[in-house]
Amino acid sequence: MAADEHGGETGDAAAEGIRAEPKGTAPTPLSVLDLVTVGAGRTATDALRTSVTLAKQAESRGYHRHWVAEHHSMPGVASSSPAVILAHLAAHTTRIRLGSGGVMLPNHAPLVIAEQFGTLEALAPGRVDLGLGRAPGTDGATAAALRRSDQLNEGADDFPQQLAELTRFLDDDFPDGHPYARIHAVPGPVQSTSPGGVQSPHRPPIWLLGSSGFSARLAGMLGLPFAFAHHFSAQNTLPALDLYRDTFRPSAVLDAPYALIGVSALATDDENEARRQVMAAALNMVRLRTGRPGLVPTPEEAEAHQFTEMERDFITSWNSNVIHGTADQVRSGLDDLAKRTGADELMLTANAHSGDIRLRSYELVADAYGLPNPA
């Protein structure tokens, strides 16, 4: 297939991996954002096993995607290497789309990302998404260690150039005379054109992720799908989505905008239990924001914590954007959010100390919307 400058392959194959139809009574397709959270008293092994169970459960219940986020130097988040985790999830699933939500492009050489996601596409043909962000996903010192440079703005400032380079590697179409013209990302298209080669898998669709206007504008100008981090930047959601739609230019990938929003949502069997779990997750966020990252505390630890006035103000603001409660309450909140934003897809992240609580939340939401239940 032909390729455009940034969007990649043309035709229906690219769009098929992006657009989806709602299931049950859900207002949009529903998907999963997995931070691979590690609770106090638990290990990274426990968290990764929960992720496998969650991916299998999400697939069976009709969730459309399972994305893994990239974060570094955070004891309570075990998703420092999305590509490795996604390869493991691919071995345990057969239909659900798997992707990065996202890979932080400035932290990596574009060629390495092209090779990693070419490998993932070879492992799970036709169901891999490449979500890209420009934030470091960590603090400044860790970002410097990842990039082997103390010029922290260097990667973010030339994000459009990095994106163009990554796309060239994915499509194997550097122009003649370019320094990288003889370099090929493998697995990739070069294998199709080599002697004895056969058609290689379609390369993963690129998504741009963001929490402000920069990525919204860039995604619109390039005609790419856009994923907005409503779960930690709710005040910017509507302006960013408006900007994306206003600047959108039809491309080889999409003929109309497609906007996904990440939503923090936790459903439990009991409303009070939801409040307890959300408070514990909020305490974890307070500690992260004040330079004291740790494992996600238990609800009991959060109840015993002596909150300062500043911490209480932060938590009140933070929790106001977490949709939580019983399944009916969460369904109502998601319906309202979809209506207010016009989002094409909702991606839910359930942050809690316990993996069982997280798994139960996705089950309850699926039940509330009448999603498929093979049991």
Task: State what each model feature region is.
Residues 1-98:
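N-terminal beta1-alpha1-beta2 module of alpha/beta enzyme domains
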Residues 30-34, 66-68, 98-100, 128-132, ...:
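Hydrophobic faces of well-ordered beta-strands that scaffold small-molecule active sites
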Residues 2-5, 14-24, 152-188, 236-342, ...:
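An alpha-helical appendage that flanks or caps ligand/catalytic pockets
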Residues 34-49, 103-111, 200-210, 318-327:
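Active-site mouth loops of central-metabolism enzymes
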Residues 212-235, 240-241:
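A conserved active-site cap/scaffold subdomain adjacent to cofactor or substrate pockets
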Residues 30, 58, 62, 70, ...:
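Conserved, mostly hydrophobic/aromatic
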Residues 25-44, 106-174, 226:
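Flexible, glycine-rich active-site loops centered on histidine and acidic residues
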Residues 22-25, 59, 86-94, 117, ...:
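Acidic (Asp/Glu)-rich catalytic clusters
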